[in-house]
Amino acid sequence: HSQGTFTSDYSKYLDTRRAQDFVQWLMST
């Protein structure tokens, strides 16, 4: 159960990272 929570939190973290990278890429273009 805790493993599933960790995995879901981790994918949320990755999504946030990806979104921030995307925004920075847009700004730098």
From Swiss-Prot:
The keyword Membrane does not apply. It comes from Anas platyrhynchos. One of its GO terms (molecular function) is hormone activity. Coiled coil: none annotated. GO terms for cellular component: extracellular region. Its main location: secreted. This is Glucagon. It comes from the Eukaryota.
